[in-house]
Amino acid sequence: NIPETEKEKNDKKNFEILKYDGIRAQRMGKLPYAIKCFEEAVAINDELETLSLLATAYTQANRLDDARITLDRMATKDPEQVNTFLSLAGICYMQEDYENMKDACQKALVLDNKNPLSFYLTAKAAIGMKDDITAIAMLTKAIVLKEDYTEAYQLRAEVLWKMKQAKDAAEDIQKLLSLNPDDEQALLLKGEILAATNEPEQAQECFNQVLSLNPFNEKAYILSGELYLANKDFDKALAIYDEAIEINPNFAKAYHERGRIKLLKGDKDGSVEDMKKAIELAPENEINISGQYNNYENMTKNVPF
């Protein structure tokens, strides 16, 4: 063994200090400092663990391009690590780069074709590429490998429902609810399917169950209000949006929907007030809302449901 030089000893010591300072800073949510520590550490020694910490910190700081470059560097350094490719797939998903997401998943599957997450992420890439048939096949493979894979059942149910396969989607939802009767996402999808297949009372039961489990579930209020509106029950629709706004006074979509109902009931002033509030809370939706607002007069003649 050749004795370490003074420089090597110093480098080793500095590397350890930087790495663990970075880990501490990351745990405390001090991301810019954590990133600086990890960057300096990998400049001394680009070992995989520290590169992985750096990639995670970049991701947390929403520096996705940097995270991707770091993960590519890890894949070049050690092309046998499945998790590197799965992390890369996750970053590509966040960037809506579904082609490269699919490639990363394929590389992960070559290394290990028994990893349910690889099939699940391949399905998400397929959905992004509007290839629902492949998505169903990949989700089915994920479920075969992991029988209680709730995310895969949920996603498969959503895709099946999008393809108007209500019966198959309902079977996946039943499986989800057998695994967890309080699964909010599954209950909402069950309610959506029941609403669309002329079972409004059972649908409302699903939405009410979700709201009793979680009074902050925004989607449940919207779906419940839409169903009341579809059945011309304006007062109940108003009540549900009143409740939503009482629980969350910053719920822009609820003001928007309540504004629609008020207009249908002939309360133009109340409607305008709610619309203004919706725009104030979510200015990014302003163009959409004002465009829709111009059509409201026509909508009152023919509610499009």
Task: Give a label for each model feature.
Residues 43-44, 77, 111, 145, ...:
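Structural marker of alpha-solenoid helical repeat scaffolds
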Residues 15, 48-49, 82-83, 116-117, ...:
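Helix-start (N-cap) detector for alpha-helical repeat units in TPR-like alpha-solenoids
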Residues 13-43, 47, 56, 60, ...:
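Alpha-helical segment of the N-proximal tetratricopeptide repeat
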Residues 26, 59, 93, 120, ...:
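Position-specific recognition of the canonical hydrophobic site in helix A of tetratricopeptide repeat
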Residues 270-305:
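Terminal, low-structured helical/coil segments at or just beyond the last alpha-helical repeat
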Residues 20, 53, 87, 121, ...:
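Canonical tetratricopeptide repeat
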Residues 28-36, 61-73, 95-107, 128-141, ...:
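Structural signature of tandem alpha-helical TPR/SEL1-like repeats
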Residues 2-17:
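TPR-adjacent "capping" and linker segments in tetratricopeptide-repeat scaffold/adaptor proteins
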